Amino acid sequence: EREGAEPAEVAEPAEAEAVAGEKLLTRIAVIGMGRLGGAENGFGSDADVMFVHEPLDGADEDAAQEQAARIVNRTLALLKQPVKPAIRAERPLEVDADLRPEGKQGAIVRSLDSYRSYYERWAETWEFQALTRARPIAGDEALGEAFVELIDPYRYPATFTPEQVQQIRRMKARVENERMPHGADRTRQLKLGRGGLSDVEWLVQLVQLRHAHAVPGLRTTSTLKALDAAVEAGLVDAADAEILSGAWLLATKIRGGNVLRGVRQSDTLPSGRADLEAIARWCGYPAGSARALEEDYLRQTRNARKVYERLFFEEL
């Protein structure tokens, strides 16, 4: 379910263009974040990424930083171009690097030492939560592994304080209130709605932040694998996990179907009969199942929301 070129396919030509006629000063790794990091991206998904570089031995650090920025910016430009040969109805690949330190105001690429300094001194709790999805996807493999070694103590901390738990809970409430489209029906919002993707993912990530240090199975960027590990460790009841995973999978499938059908609001369960029928068939329902899909989604997410509210606010 890919759109456009993968980072690994454009990194080398981007590097060649950016350093033409000059000595290579640094090595670079691309870190997948969000759904890309979790290997869960589908039709229409953004590609959330961060970039890390490491100057080569003897290279001037400032010159290496400047060169790394040129390579990264050229890579981003190439990734946004249509693939060749052209694909009918291709959607432009949206590459989002806003999860990097300091967001849009921060450097597009940082050295390993710069990341270390930031996470030690200035990072907020939600940034450690975002790192639960961080996974090297392209570039220098050894550097990618070094980045993982750097971030593991922050995303899988030995101690996750009650205050940090409260910070995550407050941030979740803020995201729900600020990012929900004005006037939207919360029961039909696939991503931010009640029992939707966000509820399941935030709950799983909170479990990881609190317990992954002691439970190796939770050290995964995959939502469903982490949920399975939580069940195995006795942190989440199997019946609750089944409800959560069922709602997450159905919301994911509907979202992909919306994109393929060209539904204008791809993060919303359609209300029109024709759209619902088409999405139902995409989800594997027999013909004439528009109402069944709607009822199933509303029921499953209603149950998932109950599980989320109980577990997200209790002392797991």
Language-model region placement:
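A nucleotide- and high-energy phosphate-metabolite-utilizing enzyme signature
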Residues: 1-316
